[in-house]
């Protein structure tokens, strides 16, 4: 892909204490994904944005990595004491990478329509700076409760777009005694005119606890519910235990397989892969590959969960049925349920582990092996919306 010389900078070094729940708001999840990840993905999806540079607080490295997963991004930059310090650090990183234009965005704005980015980049063709704004619709009064003409004011949003050299020079020249509320204020003080483009109501900043409930509802209303099913079989062989649902169960036989032959986790992995329509366990972990010889099947399910989350999925429920005459599954059901719930990120109440027999019919009835079937329920973004 041809480089456009446009980079996005997300300032995510704040603590966000007004949002509640202790976790910095940029790392809280809506619709199964960190707010920061939503902001990153919206920017990366635009064909005129080359990459996204994120600025984080020192000590947030683990939170950041959990939020972004395996997205192909530059290493995060550590922020400073104040927002402007963080912006400067991010701008330096963008400059070092040779970019010419930058879009500076708040991490706490998970909704970003492509049309807003289009308008900002178009404005930069004839201006050194551009910001998205909306009209003020509420009545405004001063502290003496005197009406103020709202037509003289705009609500300013992000991302704010700048010629990179200009915004760096503006920050270097800033002499204000107070911290600026945004970067447009810094550039305006530097004597540059700011172009105004139409923003979007979706670009609301998440600040207070109630904002997150609204954002969750907005995000999930554009999702569809889908199911996936999986089935697996392994025959018995010599051994003294089997792996089932990630739990070691003593038995007078083992299960034959290239990996640890955990039929429950294999069926569940296939169910999750089926829900996101991404092949099957054999596609991702072929038995012909020696690296999976004797592998713990927990990693297969963890991999499927990561793929599902990358696809924007919310996992809602899992149901596993083990089919065998022996061993007895009941005593190990709570441990299996707990193990699977932890991998899926679900409460145990949303994981069902059942066991049945075939009334001595077929290969399972003859105690020749074990079968398992699984169903998962998830929600995915509706690509047609």
Curated annotation (Swiss-Prot):
<keyword id="KW-0479">Metal-binding</keyword>
<dbReference type="InterPro" id="IPR001228">
    <property type="entry name" value="IspD"/>
</dbReference>
<feature type="region of interest" description="2-C-methyl-D-erythritol 2,4-cyclodiphosphate synthase">
    <location>
        <begin position="226"/>
        <end position="385"/>
    </location>
</feature>
<dbReference type="GO" id="GO:0046872">
    <property type="term" value="F:metal ion binding"/>
</dbReference>
<dbReference type="GO" id="GO:0019288">
    <property type="term" value="P:isopentenyl diphosphate biosynthetic process, methylerythritol 4-phosphate pathway"/>
</dbReference>
<feature type="site" description="Transition state stabilizer">
    <location>
        <position position="357"/>
    </location>
</feature>
<dbReference type="GO" id="GO:0016114">
    <property type="term" value="P:terpenoid biosynthetic process"/>
</dbReference>
<dbReference type="GO" id="GO:0008685">
    <property type="term" value="F:2-C-methyl-D-erythritol 2,4-cyclodiphosphate synthase activity"/>
</dbReference>
<comment type="similarity">
    <text>In the C-terminal section; belongs to the IspF family.</text>
</comment>
<comment type="similarity">
    <text>In the N-terminal section; belongs to the IspD/TarI cytidylyltransferase family. IspD subfamily.</text>
</comment>
<keyword id="KW-0808">Transferase</keyword>
<feature type="region of interest" description="2-C-methyl-D-erythritol 4-phosphate cytidylyltransferase">
    <location>
        <begin position="1"/>
        <end position="226"/>
    </location>
</feature>
<dbReference type="InterPro" id="IPR026596">
    <property type="entry name" value="IspD/F"/>
</dbReference>
<feature type="site" description="Positions MEP for the nucleophilic attack">
    <location>
        <position position="205"/>
    </location>
</feature>
<dbReference type="InterPro" id="IPR034683">
    <property type="entry name" value="IspD/TarI"/>
</dbReference>
<feature type="binding site">
    <location>
        <begin position="356"/>
        <end position="359"/>
    </location>
    <ligand>
        <name>4-CDP-2-C-methyl-D-erythritol 2-phosphate</name>
    </ligand>
</feature>
<feature type="site" description="Positions MEP for the nucleophilic attack">
    <location>
        <position position="150"/>
    </location>
</feature>
<comment type="pathway">
    <text>Isoprenoid biosynthesis; isopentenyl diphosphate biosynthesis via DXP pathway; isopentenyl diphosphate from 1-deoxy-D-xylulose 5-phosphate: step 2/6.</text>
</comment>
<comment type="pathway">
    <text>Isoprenoid biosynthesis; isopentenyl diphosphate biosynthesis via DXP pathway; isopentenyl diphosphate from 1-deoxy-D-xylulose 5-phosphate: step 4/6.</text>
</comment>
<dbReference type="InterPro" id="IPR029044">
    <property type="entry name" value="Nucleotide-diphossugar_trans"/>
</dbReference>
<feature type="binding site">
    <location>
        <begin position="280"/>
        <end position="282"/>
    </location>
    <ligand>
        <name>4-CDP-2-C-methyl-D-erythritol 2-phosphate</name>
    </ligand>
</feature>
<feature type="binding site">
    <location>
        <position position="234"/>
    </location>
    <ligand>
        <name>a divalent metal cation</name>
    </ligand>
</feature>
<feature type="site" description="Transition state stabilizer">
    <location>
        <position position="25"/>
    </location>
</feature>
<protein>
    <recommendedName>
        <fullName>Bifunctional enzyme IspD/IspF</fullName>
        <ecNumber>2.7.7.60</ecNumber>
        <ecNumber>4.6.1.12</ecNumber>
    </recommendedName>
</protein>
<dbReference type="GO" id="GO:0050518">
    <property type="term" value="F:2-C-methyl-D-erythritol 4-phosphate cytidylyltransferase activity"/>
</dbReference>
<feature type="site" description="Transition state stabilizer">
    <location>
        <position position="18"/>
    </location>
</feature>
<dbReference type="Pfam" id="PF02542">
    <property type="entry name" value="YgbB"/>
</dbReference>
<dbReference type="InterPro" id="IPR036571">
    <property type="entry name" value="MECDP_synthase_sf"/>
</dbReference>
<feature type="binding site">
    <location>
        <begin position="258"/>
        <end position="259"/>
    </location>
    <ligand>
        <name>4-CDP-2-C-methyl-D-erythritol 2-phosphate</name>
    </ligand>
</feature>
<dbReference type="InterPro" id="IPR003526">
    <property type="entry name" value="MECDP_synthase"/>
</dbReference>
<comment type="function">
    <text>Bifunctional enzyme that catalyzes the formation of 4-diphosphocytidyl-2-C-methyl-D-erythritol from CTP and 2-C-methyl-D-erythritol 4-phosphate (MEP) (IspD), and catalyzes the conversion of 4-diphosphocytidyl-2-C-methyl-D-erythritol 2-phosphate (CDP-ME2P) to 2-C-methyl-D-erythritol 2,4-cyclodiphosphate (ME-CPP) with a corresponding release of cytidine 5-monophosphate (CMP) (IspF).</text>
</comment>
<keyword id="KW-0548">Nucleotidyltransferase</keyword>
<feature type="binding site">
    <location>
        <position position="363"/>
    </location>
    <ligand>
        <name>4-CDP-2-C-methyl-D-erythritol 2-phosphate</name>
    </ligand>
</feature>
<dbReference type="Pfam" id="PF01128">
    <property type="entry name" value="IspD"/>
</dbReference>
<feature type="binding site">
    <location>
        <position position="232"/>
    </location>
    <ligand>
        <name>a divalent metal cation</name>
    </ligand>
</feature>
<keyword id="KW-0414">Isoprene biosynthesis</keyword>
<dbReference type="InterPro" id="IPR020555">
    <property type="entry name" value="MECDP_synthase_CS"/>
</dbReference>
<feature type="site" description="Transition state stabilizer">
    <location>
        <position position="258"/>
    </location>
</feature>
<feature type="binding site">
    <location>
        <position position="366"/>
    </location>
    <ligand>
        <name>4-CDP-2-C-methyl-D-erythritol 2-phosphate</name>
    </ligand>
</feature>
<keyword id="KW-0456">Lyase</keyword>
<feature type="binding site">
    <location>
        <position position="266"/>
    </location>
    <ligand>
        <name>a divalent metal cation</name>
    </ligand>
</feature>
<feature type="binding site">
    <location>
        <begin position="232"/>
        <end position="234"/>
    </location>
    <ligand>
        <name>4-CDP-2-C-methyl-D-erythritol 2-phosphate</name>
    </ligand>
</feature>
């Amino acid at each position: 892909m041809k480089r456009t010389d446009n980079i996005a900078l997300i300032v995510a070094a704040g603590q966000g204490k007004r949002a509640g729940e202790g976790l910095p708001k940029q790392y809280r999840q809506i619709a199964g994904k960190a707010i920061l990840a939503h902001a990153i993905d919206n920017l990366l999806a635009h064909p005129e944005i080359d990459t996204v540079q994120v600025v984080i607080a020192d000590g947030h490295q683990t939170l950041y990595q959990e939020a972004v997963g395996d997205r192909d991004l530059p290493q995060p930059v550590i922020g400073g004491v104040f927002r402007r310090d963080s912006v400067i650090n991010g701008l330096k990183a963008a400059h070092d990478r040779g970019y010419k234009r930058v879009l500076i965005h708040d991490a706490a704005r998970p909704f970003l329509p492509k049309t807003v980015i289009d308008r900002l980049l178009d404005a930069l063709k004839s201006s050194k700076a551009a910001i998205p704004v909306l009209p003020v619709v509420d009545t405004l009064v001063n502290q003496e409760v005197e009406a103020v003409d709202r037509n003289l004011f705009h609500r300013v949003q992000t991302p704010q777009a700048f010629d990179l050299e200009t915004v760096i020079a503006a920050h270097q020249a800033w002499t204000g005694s107070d911290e600026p509320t945004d970067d447009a204020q810094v550039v305006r003080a530097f004597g540059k005119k700011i172009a105004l483009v139409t923003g979007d109501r979706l670009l609301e900043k998440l600040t207070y606890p109630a904002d997150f409930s609204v954002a969750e509802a907005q995000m999930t209303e554009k999702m569809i519910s889908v199911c996936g099913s999986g089935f697996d079989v392994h025959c018995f062989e010599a051994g003294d235990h089997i792996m089932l649902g990630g739990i070691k169960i003593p038995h007078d036989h083992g299960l034959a397989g290239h990996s640890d032959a955990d039929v429950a986790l294999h069926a569940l992995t296939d169910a999750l892969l089926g829900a996101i329509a991404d092949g099957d366990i054999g596609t991702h972990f072929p038995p012909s590959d020696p690296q999976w010889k004797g592998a713990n099947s927990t990693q297969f399910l963890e991999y499927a969960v990561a793929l599902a989350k990358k696809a924007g999925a919310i996992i809602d429920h899992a149901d596993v049925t083990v089919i065998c005459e022996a061993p007895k599954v009941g005593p190990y059901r709570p441990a299996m349920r707990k193990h699977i719930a932890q991998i899926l990120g679900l409460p145990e109440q949303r994981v069902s582990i059942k066991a049945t027999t075939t009334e001595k019919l077929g290969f399972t009835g003859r105690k020749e092996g074990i079968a398992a079937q699984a169903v998962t329920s998830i929600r995915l973004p509706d690509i047609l919306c």
